[in-house]
Amino acid sequence: MTRDVVACERCPRLRAWCREVAEVKVRRFQDQEYWGRPVPGWGDPAARLLIVGLAPAAHGGNRTGRIFTGDRSGDFLFAALHRAGFANQPTSVARGDGLRLLDCYVAAAARCAPPANRPLPEEIGRCREYLAREWRLLRRVRAVLALGKVSQDAFVALLRGMGRVPPRKAFAFGHGVRHDLGEGLHLFASFHPSQQNTFTGKLTAAGMDTVLADVNRHLGRRGRPATRRTS
């Protein structure tokens, strides 16, 4: 499946943007070779936690070839995953940096870096097949953490397409909101760890720790007090 993701050309707008960014670069990364292709998900194949992000960053995953790697969002996320016991180290700098995910797998709603960090709905729809294939492979998942409303909507759309949730059931989004999807599967929500959210204090390290503590409690791992719950 990784080969299929990397070779994907379904979204001309996204492919053109990723290639342009990889060629032009930014000054601080002028000496680096950019990945410039779709970015596959990665992590523990026996994971019970699936994290769904939005898309690779233009100078993060699109540069390094690994989602949430080499950018400020990844710095924030993996530090939190390390504190919660889902990663063996707090940093994600580049492929081959020694980072391992423990009981956790990271995917995205869109696999190419989008202009202005905003993939179009139809582009997310074209990427859904890859998330569906990962979902079928990750047979032990009992917790899904959606980073942002768009990511949550993408995952819910996947479940609707599979007949896993009722067609008209509404899923409220909010930081710390939790939905029971039945059969032991719970959907957790967090604000996306973008600089816009972390630099303004909308999402804090303590706030992310609280959500991950709730995930840990659900999975029977060591955790902190639960977040608020809906559904």
Residue ranges, per PLM feature:
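A polyanion-binding, active-site-adjacent surface
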Residues: 1-171, 175-177, 181-221
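Generic C-terminal helix-cap and adjacent flexible tail
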Residues: 217-231
